[in-house]
Amino acid sequence: MEINREEFSEVVVNIGRVTKVVKGGRRFRFNALVVVGNKNGLVGFGLGKAKEVPDAIKKAIDDAFKNIIKVNIKGTTIAHDIEHKYNASRILLKPASEGTGVIAGGSTRPVIELAGIKDILTKSLGSNNPYNVVRATIDALARIKA
Protein backbone atom coordinates (compact mmCIF):
# COMPACT_ATOMS: atom_id res chain seq x y z
CA MET A 1 0.00 0.00 0.00
CA GLU A 2 1.55 3.29 -1.14
CA ILE A 3 1.17 6.04 1.45
CA ASN A 4 1.42 9.75 0.65
CA ARG A 5 2.26 11.47 3.94
CA GLU A 6 0.89 14.85 2.78
CA GLU A 7 -2.67 13.44 2.77
CA PHE A 8 -2.48 12.50 6.45
CA SER A 9 -3.28 14.56 9.54
CA GLU A 10 -1.68 13.83 12.87
CA VAL A 11 -2.87 14.38 16.41
CA VAL A 12 -0.70 14.16 19.52
CA VAL A 13 -2.85 12.20 21.97
CA ASN A 14 -0.51 12.13 24.94
CA ILE A 15 2.91 13.34 26.04
CA GLY A 16 4.44 11.67 29.06
CA ARG A 17 7.50 12.62 31.08
CA VAL A 18 9.63 10.05 32.84
CA THR A 19 12.33 10.91 35.34
CA LYS A 20 15.53 9.07 36.09
CA VAL A 21 17.18 10.22 39.30
CA VAL A 22 20.97 10.22 39.05
CA LYS A 23 23.73 11.46 41.34
CA GLY A 24 23.76 14.89 39.68
CA GLY A 25 19.97 15.39 39.78
CA ARG A 26 17.08 14.35 37.60
CA ARG A 27 17.21 13.30 33.94
CA PHE A 28 13.95 13.81 32.03
CA ARG A 29 12.85 11.87 28.96
CA PHE A 30 9.61 12.22 27.06
CA ASN A 31 7.31 9.86 25.22
CA ALA A 32 4.62 10.87 22.73
CA LEU A 33 1.57 8.97 21.51
CA VAL A 34 0.46 10.13 18.06
CA VAL A 35 -2.46 9.10 15.84
CA VAL A 36 -2.29 9.67 12.05
CA GLY A 37 -5.09 9.31 9.52
CA ASN A 38 -6.24 10.48 6.11
CA LYS A 39 -9.94 10.81 7.13
CA ASN A 40 -10.75 8.31 4.39
CA GLY A 41 -10.36 4.89 6.02
CA LEU A 42 -6.64 4.80 6.84
CA VAL A 43 -5.50 5.31 10.44
CA GLY A 44 -2.50 4.36 12.57
CA PHE A 45 -0.81 5.16 15.86
CA GLY A 46 2.76 5.33 17.06
CA LEU A 47 4.82 5.82 20.19
CA GLY A 48 8.07 7.78 20.22
CA LYS A 49 10.58 8.33 23.00
CA ALA A 50 13.35 10.93 23.18
CA LYS A 51 15.12 13.45 25.40
CA GLU A 52 13.15 16.34 23.85
CA VAL A 53 9.40 16.57 23.10
CA PRO A 54 9.67 17.49 19.36
CA ASP A 55 12.01 14.53 18.75
CA ALA A 56 9.61 12.18 20.55
CA ILE A 57 6.69 13.46 18.41
CA LYS A 58 8.70 13.02 15.20
CA LYS A 59 9.62 9.44 16.17
CA ALA A 60 5.98 8.72 17.07
CA ILE A 61 4.78 9.98 13.66
CA ASP A 62 7.34 7.79 11.89
CA ASP A 63 6.20 4.82 14.00
CA ALA A 64 2.53 5.57 13.25
CA PHE A 65 3.12 5.36 9.49
CA LYS A 66 4.49 1.84 10.03
CA ASN A 67 1.25 0.78 11.79
CA ILE A 68 -1.46 1.98 9.39
CA ILE A 69 -4.65 -0.05 9.06
CA LYS A 70 -7.60 0.09 6.66
CA VAL A 71 -11.00 0.71 8.26
CA ASN A 72 -14.17 -0.54 6.57
CA ILE A 73 -16.54 2.44 6.62
CA LYS A 74 -20.18 1.98 5.60
CA GLY A 75 -21.50 5.39 4.51
CA THR A 76 -20.67 7.70 7.41
CA THR A 77 -20.54 5.03 10.12
CA ILE A 78 -19.36 1.46 10.76
CA ALA A 79 -21.10 -1.73 9.61
CA HIS A 80 -21.85 -3.33 12.99
CA ASP A 81 -21.39 -3.15 16.77
CA ILE A 82 -18.03 -4.24 18.06
CA GLU A 83 -16.47 -4.62 21.48
CA HIS A 84 -12.74 -5.05 21.97
CA LYS A 85 -10.45 -5.40 24.96
CA TYR A 86 -6.76 -4.54 25.13
CA ASN A 87 -5.11 -5.09 28.53
CA ALA A 88 -7.48 -3.45 31.05
CA SER A 89 -9.17 -1.13 28.52
CA ARG A 90 -12.45 -2.11 26.91
CA ILE A 91 -14.01 -0.18 24.04
CA LEU A 92 -17.54 -0.41 22.62
CA LEU A 93 -18.24 0.95 19.13
CA LYS A 94 -21.80 1.21 17.78
CA PRO A 95 -22.98 2.47 14.39
CA ALA A 96 -25.12 5.61 14.52
CA SER A 97 -27.61 7.18 12.13
CA GLU A 98 -26.51 10.05 9.90
CA GLY A 99 -26.33 13.39 11.70
CA THR A 100 -25.47 11.90 15.10
CA GLY A 101 -21.82 12.93 14.96
CA VAL A 102 -18.86 11.42 16.76
CA ILE A 103 -19.84 10.64 20.33
CA ALA A 104 -16.49 9.64 21.75
CA GLY A 105 -14.31 10.86 24.56
CA GLY A 106 -10.69 10.98 25.51
CA SER A 107 -8.21 9.08 23.38
CA THR A 108 -10.93 7.40 21.28
CA ARG A 109 -12.04 10.60 19.50
CA PRO A 110 -8.87 11.36 17.48
CA VAL A 111 -8.72 7.75 16.23
CA ILE A 112 -12.36 7.82 15.09
CA GLU A 113 -12.10 11.27 13.48
CA LEU A 114 -8.84 10.55 11.64
CA ALA A 115 -10.29 7.26 10.35
CA GLY A 116 -12.99 9.32 8.61
CA ILE A 117 -15.99 8.03 10.57
CA LYS A 118 -18.62 10.79 10.88
CA ASP A 119 -21.38 9.10 12.93
CA ILE A 120 -20.61 6.68 15.77
CA LEU A 121 -21.38 5.97 19.41
CA THR A 122 -18.50 4.84 21.60
CA LYS A 123 -17.99 3.91 25.21
CA SER A 124 -14.67 3.40 26.93
CA LEU A 125 -14.74 1.07 29.93
CA GLY A 126 -12.07 -0.01 32.38
CA SER A 127 -8.63 1.56 32.21
CA ASN A 128 -8.38 4.95 30.53
CA ASN A 129 -4.64 4.72 29.90
CA PRO A 130 -4.27 6.59 26.57
CA TYR A 131 -2.03 3.96 24.93
CA ASN A 132 -4.37 1.08 25.83
CA VAL A 133 -7.51 2.97 24.75
CA VAL A 134 -5.99 3.96 21.37
CA ARG A 135 -4.73 0.42 20.80
CA ALA A 136 -8.13 -1.10 21.72
CA THR A 137 -9.93 1.34 19.38
CA ILE A 138 -7.60 0.65 16.44
CA ASP A 139 -7.79 -3.12 17.00
CA ALA A 140 -11.61 -2.89 17.10
CA LEU A 141 -11.73 -0.83 13.88
CA ALA A 142 -9.43 -3.34 12.17
CA ARG A 143 -11.81 -6.19 13.06
CA ILE A 144 -14.89 -4.58 11.47
CA LYS A 145 -16.13 -6.65 8.55
CA ALA A 146 -17.39 -4.86 5.44
Swiss-Prot record:
Transmembrane segments: none annotated. Keywords: Ribonucleoprotein, Ribosomal protein, RNA-binding, rRNA-binding. GO terms for biological process: translation. It comes from the Bacteria. InterPro entries: Ribosomal_Su5_D2-typ_SF, Ribosomal_uS5, Ribosomal_uS5_bac-type, Ribosomal_uS5_C, Ribosomal_uS5_N, Ribosomal_uS5_N_CS, Ribsml_uS5_D2-typ_fold_subgr. One of its GO terms (molecular function) is rRNA binding. GO terms for cellular component: small ribosomal subunit. Signal peptide: none annotated. Residues 8-71 form the S5 DRBM domain. Part of the 30S ribosomal subunit. Contacts proteins S4 and S8. The N-terminal domain interacts with the head of the 30S subunit; the C-terminal domain interacts with the body and contacts protein S4. The interaction surface between S4 and S5 is involved in control of translational fidelity. With S4 and S12 plays an important role in translational accuracy. Located at the back of the 30S subunit body where it stabilizes the conformation of the head with respect to the body. Belongs to the universal ribosomal protein uS5 family. This is Small ribosomal subunit protein uS5. It comes from Helicobacter hepaticus (strain ATCC 51449 / 3B1). The lineage of its organism: Bacteria, Pseudomonadati, Campylobacterota, Epsilonproteobacteria, Campylobacterales.
